[in-house]
């Protein structure tokens, strides 16, 4: 099966990434990607875009040359309370909210601290998807996190970049996470975590994890634009007519 939805991509607004919005559109069109999200790092990261970047995402068109674009953020989980670096009514203006641990904002601590932070972030209602929860720098109680995510309709990401250029040692953790989410009845989503447009929609290693555990395709949000958009609507985001052309 070809997966034509990607929820995790960074532009040059995060200055350790190397592609523009237009670069991503060109690659998406060439690869036949139907829907992707621009999710630059939240403002507490040292080289992240200014807060206004996210406020002004309203200027981005939702459909360009047949490709759907989601306005999003990869927020930083800041502390054990699960707080993130984007807040209030501004969150409601975004189409998708990812959040995860990043060393400059939340330095690695203990397994219990990481688990508490993730569960509190999940329970806050502010986060749709937890990014790279398999990061070996942040050990977690996988069953507790998977159970909380399933209960609160939050998806956990299998991050393809973790197997390639960062967070080496994630494979066993991601297999454990996928098995736990499967058992809990929860949702997974694959993210390329692209920092250059060429990797948009590339999920080869993440797919291996999905196939290894026999994860049910009907609970994988990348399976179609409709699956992801329905999930986001169920999470309280606006249902937008502009995306109707993406639904088969």
UniProtKB/Swiss-Prot annotation:
It comes from Shewanella frigidimarina (strain NCIMB 400). GO terms for biological process: bacterial-type flagellum-dependent swarming motility. Belongs to the PHP family. This is Probable phosphatase Sfri_3709. Binds 3 Zn(2+) ions per subunit. Zn(2+) 3 binds at residues 74, 102, 132. It is an enzyme of class 3 (hydrolase). Pfam families: PHP.
């Amino acid at each position: 099966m070809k997966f034509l939805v990607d929820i995790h991509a960074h532009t040059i607004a995060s200055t350790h990434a190397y592609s523009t919005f237009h670069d991503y559109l060109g690659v998406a069109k060439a690869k036949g990607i139907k829907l992707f999200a621009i999710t630059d790092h939240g403002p507490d990261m040292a080289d992240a875009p200014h807060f206004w970047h996210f406020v002004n995402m309203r200027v981005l068109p939702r459909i360009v040359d047949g490709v759907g674009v989601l306005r999003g953020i990869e927020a930083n989980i800041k502390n054990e309370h699960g707080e993130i670096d984007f807040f209030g009514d501004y969150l409601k203006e975004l189409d998708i909210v990812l959040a995860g641990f990043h060393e400059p904002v939340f330095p690695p601590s203990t397994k219990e601290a990481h688990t508490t932070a993730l569960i509190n972030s999940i329970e806050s209602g502010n986060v749709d998807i937890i990014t790279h929860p398999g990061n070996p720098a942040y050990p977690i109680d996988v069953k507790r996190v998977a159970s909380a995510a399933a209960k609160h309709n939050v998806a956990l990401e299998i991050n393809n970049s973790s197997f390639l250029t960062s967070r080496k040692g994630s494979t066993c953790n991601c297999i454990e996470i996928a098995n736990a989410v499967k058992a809990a009845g929860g949702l997974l989503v694959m993210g390329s975590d692209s920092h250059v447009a060429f990797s948009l929609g590339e999920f080869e290693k993440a797919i291996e994890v999905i196939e290894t555990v026999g994860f049910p395709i009907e609970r994988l949000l990348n399976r179609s634009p409709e699956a992801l958009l329905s999930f986001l609507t169920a999470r309280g985001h606006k249902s937008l007519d502009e995306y109707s052309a993406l639904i088969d």
